[in-house]
Structures are given as C-alpha cells and as structure tokens.
Regions:
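One-carbon transfer enzymes
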Residues: 1-176, 206, 219-222, 228-230, ...
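C-terminal accessory region of SF2 helicases/translocases
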Residues: 167-168, 173-253
Length: 253
C-alpha cells in the first residue's frame, strides 16, 4: 500500500501521527523542502529515502538544478539518499547521471530528472527490501551547497560575459525569470543565445525580427524571447512590432 501526503510541517506529534499509524516500510521524499525531524526519520522500517536532483555531494540544498546550470556543469543526475538529520548529508543508495544540454532550461531539466528519479526509485525499492543495497557515505570534501534562488539574483548584470548571462537566463526559466530594465520597466528574458557583437554592456547593437543583439562585458547576446511587465512571452519580432527599440538603447537602466 502506498500513501501520498505533503504536510506543511512535521514538528508536532499530531502531524506525525498519520505516518506512524501507517507502519510503513519506507518513506520516499521528493522536492519536499523541509528537513525531517529525527522522530520522523525513525518511523519507517527501512528509513526515509530522498530523491535528490543532483549528483551528491555536489549541490546539496534547495536549488540544485538552477545551480548546476548556472555553474556550467555538463552533467547532473539523481541521487537516492538515506535521509538523516543533516541537509542532504546521508549515505548514497543509488545514483544515475544525465547530461545537461547546451540549451537546457531549469524547467526542461527538472522534467527529465523527475522522470529519471521515478525510474530509479522503482528499481531501488525491491533491492532495498531484499537487503542488497550497501549505503555509501558522501565525501564531505566535495560538498557544494545549492542556496535558494532569490529574485535579485535573477537580475541581469550586463557587465558579465555573454555566456554567463545565457546560463543565468536558462537557469531561471521558468522561475523566477532572469530580468533587466528597459525605460524603467521590468523586462524578463526567456530565450537568448551568444552571438557576435561588441558594444557597451547593456547596449542594444541590433534590433531585428531575428533577435535583439545586446552588448555584454564580454561578447554579445541575441535575445529571442522576452516579456514586458504585465505582458506575455513573445518572440523578438512580436516585441519589436509593439515597441520602438533602436540601436543605442540601453538595458539595465
């Protein structure tokens, strides 16, 4: 029998009672966001297994998918971990790797990792029941923390290299959305690519239906999809049809 639940808190005995009364063999945790108290970890016969969206111990914490893309990692994966009181510190039960594509967004990578995690946990549980799994401790020397993403972190700094900003746009798609300012109004960028061009950081070098080319601290970005405050996501051609944007305009001011 499988019981699904997402309690807002497990601090109280009343909140933990349904888990205790289920007399479960194992509890599987995915994208829960809270550290489980030891009283909960001790309830299932085989403990609690977390499906974590990174190759632990790299990217422990709340935002492993976004951090992997921001860092330019070429691969990530799923770690099935025996949960303990620390934050993503428990021994590893299984691991599966996945390449990060050059145009990968946090949204697309999340979906691929979710599918991979589902397959891996289904494969693990019978082995766990049979006593065939040998937990492997994490190497603390390799631990990297994936801090929670804040809105201000999604603000584009045009002084940075184009490749770094492109990763930022992909990492924050769909949430919270990488953003800049145009004429005092917030502007979110959803799809960009690095391109040739040289100019001042944030300067519009070219504005055509094929894309809006913007200078960066190193190189340039071609903006392909964007969204003004209160509007919808549109391609460059649709945006320019409704907005006068000429070379020389500056983003970020």
């Amino acid at each position: 029998m499988c019981i699904r639940d997402r309690p807002e808190s497990l601090r109280s005995e009343a909140a933990r009672r349904p888990i205790a009364e289920a007399h479960g063999d194992v509890m599987v945790v995915a994208a829960y966001g809270l550290i489980l108290p030891q009283a909960v970890l001790d309830l299932p016969r085989w403990g609690c297994v977390n499906i974590h969206a990174s190759l632990l111990p790299r990217w422990r914490g709340a935002a492993p998918i976004q951090r992997a893309i921001l860092a330019g990692d070429e691969e990530t994966g799923i770690t099935l971990m025996q949960m303990e009181a620390g934050l993503d510190t428990g021994p590893i039960l299984a691991m599966a790797r996945l390449p990060i594509g050059p145009e990968e967004t946090a949204g697309s990578l999340h979906d691929r990792l979710a599918a991979l995690g589902a397959r891996e946990i289904v494969a693990l549980l019978p082995r766990l029941a049979a006593g065939e799994v040998v937990p492997q401790p994490q190497d603390e020397r390799l631990a990297v923390y994936a801090a929670k993403i804040g809105k201000e972190e999604a603000r584009i700094d045009w002084q940075r290299p184009a490749a770094q900003i492109a990763r930022q746009v992909r990492a924050f798609n769909p949430h919270p959305g990488a953003w800049t300012v145009l004429d005092g109004q917030l502007l979110k960028l959803w799809q960009v690519r690095c391109c040739e061009g040289q100019g001042q950081p944030g300067e519009v070098l070219q504005a055509s239906p094929a894309g809006i080319v913007v200078g960066c601290g190193e190189g340039a970005l071609c903006v392909l999809e964007l969204q003004k405050a209160g509007g919808r996501r549109v391609d460059a051609a649709a945006f320019l049809a409704g907005h006068a944007l000429a070379p020389g305009a500056v983003l970020g001011e």
